[in-house]
Structures are given as C-alpha cells and as structure tokens.
C-alpha cells in the first residue's frame, strides 16, 4: 500500500499544483475495490466545483497512467474542519489545535488520545491531554492524527 501511495502522490501532486491547489493528503481504503480519497486545500477554501475540476483532471491522468489495478472509486474533497494530519509539517502548522491521535501500538493500555497539539519537536508531536498530562509520540508511530474542532 505504501508503494501505491507514493505512486499516487507522484502523479497527483503536480496536477493539483498546476491547478492552483495544495495537495493536503491521499488516503486509500478498502480491499478489492479501493477507494482513493484525495484531499485538496486552497487559501480561499474549496468548493464542490473545485473538487469536480480536480477530479476530472486526475481521472484523465489515471486513465493513461493506470496507477491502480482493477476498479476503484475516486473521491476528491476538502480536508474539512476535522482534517487528518498527514505529515509532520502539517502538524507544525496546527500547533494549538485540539486533536485526536490513534497509535499503531498501545501506549500503556490505550491507543486513542485526545488533547491539544502542544508542540512539535523533530518528528515527535507532543499533546497536552485532557487530564493535563503531556505525552509525546513519534509521528511514524501514529495510525492517525486528526484535528478535533471544539464547538463549545
């Protein structure tokens, strides 16, 4: 799956950049018929029309490059308010935000953590948990890190 993701980034990033968008991230889910989710961002936000434009361009290139064997579903969307954080650079830009983290392996007895993204040090993200404790994770040991908007 890592090789497929690398190939997809290599194909999709220049397309989104040429169209004036930021490639926020790519997620591939499912087995058999895959769903390829491409998240784009723009300083002025992302509309449904933007997603349609990007989707059409990517589909045309995928038809030629054929990066995915078999059938797949292509979804293009904004990362949204509860955006997934795909890399350490994005994490640095989101310091101070409420986040939810899911680890690949249990830390103590838990894999899910919620708190404020306090800071980034090298490849480590440090969260200030709801109970006031700080915890550090190597970014590569996280299954998922996502912004968790506070609506209170």
From Swiss-Prot:
One of its GO terms (cellular component) is cytosol. The lineage of its organism: Bacteria, Pseudomonadati, Pseudomonadota, Gammaproteobacteria, Thiotrichales. Keywords: Cytoplasm, Ribosome biogenesis. Required for maturation of 30S ribosomal subunits. It is found in: Cytoplasm. Belongs to the RimP family. This is Ribosome maturation factor RimP. It comes from the Bacteria. It comes from Francisella tularensis subsp. tularensis (strain SCHU S4 / Schu 4). Transmembrane segments: none annotated. InterPro entries: Ribosome_maturation_RimP (IPR003728), RimP_C (IPR028998), RimP_C_sf (IPR036847), RimP_N (IPR028989), RimP_N_sf (IPR035956). The keyword Nucleotide-binding does not apply. GO terms for biological process: ribosomal small subunit assembly; translation.
